[in-house]
């Protein structure tokens, strides 16, 4: 729905699936060689889903999952299963990511938003000072840990706020969503103070 919204500029590149998929924004075709590098270490959605089948307490998310397997799971349910799930994923050569006390992702090894964004920046020869990352849940943590200048928008997951508290390049906004990003643009001085794009319109 967002990509078809004429009011939203279409991105040149899209990193999605928690970093497991990277495509051209206008054609939605895989961006090579980055995508092939990720795919080479992914055993396949069906293989991973079958390995996770014994964990009946996990509820599969109804989203496209070509390069990840994603589930819903609350903390109390996950606690006694976590070690077994991590062992099963490790046997497949996969990583486990849990965020927002709800989202459980089985991912290709060494794959996350931060690593994929860093690889994309190198491919495009983009200097880090031209990059601003934003997020609100723990699955965004890797972008901040990768050293990019970033903002945790208002109402972020407490675990993300805590994990980024000591990161020099990360700023914590008070406004949620896009408002927090605008605050960060102003904080980091990415636009001139009188730029009309800097201030959100008031109702």
Map each language-model feature to its residues.
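Conserved acidic, metal-coordinating active-site core of Asp-based
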Residues: 45-146
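Short, charged/polar "capping" segments at the starts of alpha-helices
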Residues: 1, 78-79, 158-161
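Conserved beta-strand termini and adjacent loop/short-helix elements that scaffold enzyme active sites
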Residues: 17, 99-101, 175
